[in-house]
Amino acid sequence: MLTIHAAPLLLPVGAAPVPDGAVAVDGGRIAALGPYDEVAAAAPGARVRRWPGVLTPGLRQWHAPWLLRRCYHPDPREYDALGELPLWGADLAALELTETRWSGSVRRGLQRMLGHGTTALAAPGARFTDPLVAQAVARSGLRVVPVTGAPGLLLGDRPDLDPFAEGHDLAGTVHGPLEVGARADLAVFDAEDETALTAKGAASCVATVIEGRLLYRSR
């Protein structure tokens, strides 16, 4: 089914921002993008999803292997004891983690990446060798891409689920621009423009679409 994702501002990357913009998705590919009126006129009968904020390409997470196997993502039932943030280093070493707990952590980590507008995970050789992680990633729908061009270092005091934590602008954080014929990997953020988005960070994510499928929405 043809679906149109529309937002007050479309930031395709590599092309000018489009006020009241839209992206038409046919299956898993982008069929059209531009001003909403033009996209809608070319796709009569399409389902329309209207989002607040900015519509962008999906983001790329450079440190997925670290975040998924060297960090523990607490279950909500553990928040009182462990907090909500990923645990690593000495805090991780203090936990007694069975494979069952690790499996739950990896699944939660992937869900939280989706909740940060992430659609692509960078990994050496564009694959995960850890079977537990590889299986969970395959089920998640997240795309695995090479680490070519990675900054190579974790910035800040701790691993961060926010791809913008590397300090890049939008163009340096997405996996690729929105283009007709490309995979429909999109993200929507509750921000007025790119400046506001990079200031607020990817936790402002409203929705994440991978290959045309809506895999996360916060509202």
Question: For each of these PLM feature ranges, what is it?
Answer:
Residues 1-42, 162-199, 209-219:
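N-terminal metal-binding scaffold of metallo-dependent hydrolase/deaminase domains
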Residues 6-8, 52, 122-127, 190:
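Structural motif
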Residues 76-82, 86-88, 96, 143-161:
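Long, charge-dense
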Residues 93-115:
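Alpha-helix-centered segments that form part of catalytic cores
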Residues 116-155:
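Active-site loop-helix segments enriched in His/Asp/Glu that coordinate
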